[in-house]
Amino acid sequence: MYYIVEITSRGSETFLEGFEDIGEAWDVVSRLRCEARRRRQKVRYEVR
């Protein structure tokens, strides 16, 4: 199982969703990163 983790500028981590397929997880991370850039949020996303 692959999980998306949201990491804030303060270092706090929030586990968002779990995915069976790593490709699907990375697609969601890509969309989240684009949305964060549009909102100018200082957030990082990883798949673990």
Regions found by a protein language model. Name each.
Residues 3-7:
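A short beta-strand micro-motif
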Residues 13-17, 26, 30-48:
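Short, mixed-charge low-complexity intrinsically disordered segments
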